[in-house]
Amino acid sequence: MAAAVHGALKAVGEDFYRDAIEHCRSYNARLSAERSTRLPFLDAQTGVAQSDCYIWMERSHRGPGLSPGQIYSYPARCWRKKRRLNILEDPRLRPLCDAPQKKELGSAVAEGAVLEALLCAEPPKEPKEEEALLDCQKPPPGDFAHDAEGDEMEDDAPRRKNKAKGKTYGLGAVRKRQDAAALEDRDKPYVCDICGKRYKNRPGLSYHYTHTHLAEEEGEESAERHPLPFQRRNHHKQFYKELNWVPESQRRHAAAAGRRSEGPCDFCVGGAVRRAALGHEEMIACADCGRAGHPSCLQFTLAMAAAARSYRWQCIECKNCSLCGSAENDEQLLFCDDCDRGYHMYCISPPVAEPPEGTWSCHLCLRQLKDKAAAFITLT
């Protein structure tokens, strides 16, 4: 060993060898100090949770061996448990901590006495209020005769515990209903002005208008043309017609539509009313976005303008199918040349693959105008 060391000293020089030994010693000292202060971590390569194991000792900790063949022994590190806050050590907090335990102990003793009395087939001594409550909760004679003793053993204590909860049940139910109503108002912002039903999107509301209120109007017109032997019970609608009275919801809708149509025309930026070549001309407002335009700017005939004012007319940006209520696939929409309603080519009956040549009229205009419809005039 000594010969090897002397050979290394002669080869590299004594100063270089001494510096190398010093650097090695300092590196080992730094590594040992770093390991002793290293925090626990998860090794990403091995997946092992590495933590300080306290096996790194100093030279001053060495002691003589305690067993045969042992050269050194080191003192065992004491296991230290972290102290936690114990509120029972404070004498001022002890009464507050003992109060719930006494209450639970008292309730447990009371329940134990009741159960013991039930097991002994002796009626428990209860206040009159609890006796009246139990009499009201007894099943009628026609019910199935279950084991009454077992039912009382299982249900007697929960009934007494839930007795105080009945006072606040009404307030909680009212609060839940109010929260549900507010949530519905937020989830369904589109409201029908006629019946008050709410929808999540505008196409659903338009579908509701078309298939509910428009269908009711068509049914009333057909009933007037073909009177039935019995009288309908819609006396309030006939009463409104006789008095020339409009419901409040419809008046609000009409007033809102009138306010929206007071703006300028989106095409000519003119006023709400202007003198056209055909005479006095009023703008038509979209029922969804409120944008308006003159019939001549929209290239409407007099019949189309009159028909557009008879229902919830929509502009080209808001137009959706009058049958399915959807605004998707707008390239498949057909527009009626009499009322300007939109229909998908696959929604009409019979469905068509290509738009028809010339003018086209929807089934509503064909039913109402008959031989005066634009499609009928084109065919003739």
UniProtKB/Swiss-Prot annotation:
Binding site for Zn(2+) 3: 321, 324, 344, 347
GO BP, sorted A to Z: nervous system development
Record-listed Zn(2+) 1 binding positions: 265, 268, 294, 297
Highest taxon of source: Eukaryota
Residues at which Zn(2+) 2 binds: 286, 289, 315
Renumbered zinc finger spans (C2H2-type): 190-213
Record keyword Repeat present: yes
Subcellular localization(s) per the UniProt record: Cytoplasm; Nucleus
GO MF term set: zinc ion binding
Zinc finger feature spans (PHD-type): 262-321, 318-368
Region described as Disordered: 132-164
Keyword terms: Cytoplasm, Metal-binding, Neurogenesis, Nucleus, Repeat, Transcription, Transcription regulation, Zinc, Zinc-finger
CDD domains noted in UniProt: PHD2_d4 (cd15530)
Predominant subcellular localization, coarse grouping: cytoplasm
GO annotation, cellular component aspect: cytoplasm; nBAF complex
Pfam families: DPF1-3_N, PHD
Cited SMART domains: PHD, ZnF_C2H2
Subunit structure as annotated in this protein's UniProt entry: Component of neuron-specific chromatin remodeling complex (nBAF complex), a subfamily of ATP-dependent SWI/SNF chromatin remodeling complexes.
Its biological purpose: May have an important role in developing neurons by participating in regulation of cell survival, possibly as a neurospecific transcription factor. Belongs to the neuron-specific chromatin remodeling complex (nBAF complex) and plays a role in neural development.
Family recorded in the similarity comment: Belongs to the requiem/DPF family.
Name under which the protein is recorded: Zinc finger protein neuro-d4
Taxonomy of the source species: Eukaryota, Metazoa, Chordata, Craniata, Vertebrata
